[in-house]
Amino acid sequence: MLRKLTSNSSRWTTTHLGSLWQEVGGHPIRRGLILHHHCRPLAAVSSGVILRQKEESRWSPNSGGKLANLRCWPEYRLHSATKRRTLGELVLRDYSSNNISDKKPEPKSLLQSIVQNPYARLMRIDRPIGSWLLFWPCGWSIALSAPAGCWPDLWTLTLFGAGAFIMRGAGCTINDMWDRDIDGKVARTRNRPLVAGELTSADAWFFLGAQLGVGLLILLELNWYSIVLGASSLGLVIIYPLMKRITHWPQLVLGMTFNWGALLGWSATQGSVMWSACLPLYVAGVCWTIVYDTIYAHQDKVDDALLGIKSTAIRFGDNTKLWLSGFSTAMIGGLVASGMVCEQTWPYYSAVGVISAHLAHQIYSLNIDNPTDCATKFISNHQVGLILFLGIVLGTLYKGYSQRAGKSSTTSSSSTSSSSSPSSGLLLAATNHHQPARQAS
């Protein structure tokens, strides 16, 4: 709790730091501190509370109650476990009226306005990496199902790309609705729209319904086998956010959810799932998800441990790299098995080799105690998905080229052997010798 100065008098009132707006002299300040010119010690503020600067402003004692420039450090912790701060240490004040600025903020571009919209942030438009990670298993399966020498079906790829974008947004909405009581206590998630009060639960329900409606329209473009198969994954989408409260393996459930496209992509193009090819691909994708989402979870492991949230990052602990190496090896094994069933060629296996090196570098250089490094390594998995997709496409094209070259070689050798055979030549000569006699008779 902090004390704030009201706009119409000099008396102090007590208000919570988390309140969104405070009117002073007619100026709304969001998540800032409105302070009297006397600094008072900050007796007790819960650890992890962060001051965010919405507008630069200072309190001037000679301004007649108007707002001049009070400044707060953005994302500055009020106190940590080892040191307690006072308001004098946190606030920079300048009482000179010459520093008062009437400069208006620069207008936002259309793209900025869209990205910063609370509904857009609810579905993580500003962070497209999740949509890519959801799309790549679909793309792998669609490309593997293409006939030898053919490109993957562009229309199917487009449908699955749109579906990945929409359903990832729906999954994020469901996740935020389940985790509303938790997100406000975690530094990385405390500014999400539902926690910050920018959207209500009713808004989120309405938006979720709209996203699921669009997702259903996309699903109805597929065959009935794929419609049933796709709809059966909705249960995983709903229960995943609950798993972090129940088990240390929520990343396993996320992997089962995110890689459903490895099954669905094949059925969308072929009418059913070829399990001998798709199941190893699906298992490989699940292992891949456990790898990258464990890295991601290490960003929040301190807050998660305090709140009782479970994850593979907490389960693996200091043995994380050993576990990640095991799951990476299983992923490579699944990719090799799927490639063998599909009779893939050297471009595919070359891509698998590059992915092996990429994952090895990720794990070797990973600093699990550095959130920035964890975020960088997590995002780099987009490259893993792209490399494998290109390897499948090039391998399929090369397979068609090899088959055509083999047929041409077989036809040529057969023709050569027929024309050079002595018995064939004698038979042809005998046939030509007796042909006029048959015509005369």
UniProtKB/Swiss-Prot annotation:
EC main group: transferase
GO MF annotation list: 4-hydroxybenzoate polyprenyltransferase activity
Tagged with keyword Nucleus: no
The keyword GTP-binding is assigned to this record: no
Cofactor: Mg(2+)
Bias-annotated ranges (Polar residues): 432-441
Family annotation (PROSITE patterns): UBIA (PS00943)
Primary residence: mitochondrion
Localization in the cell: Mitochondrion inner membrane
Compositional bias ranges of the Low complexity kind: 408-424
E.C. number: 2.5.1.39
Pathway given in the UniProt record: Cofactor biosynthesis; ubiquinone biosynthesis
Catalytic reaction equation(s): an all-trans-polyprenyl diphosphate + 4-hydroxybenzoate = a 4-hydroxy-3-(all-trans-polyprenyl)benzoate + diphosphate
Family listed: Belongs to the UbiA prenyltransferase family.
HAMAP family documented for this protein: UbiA (MF_01635)
UniProt name for this protein: 4-hydroxybenzoate polyprenyltransferase, mitochondrial
Organism of origin: Aedes aegypti
The gene coding this protein: coq2
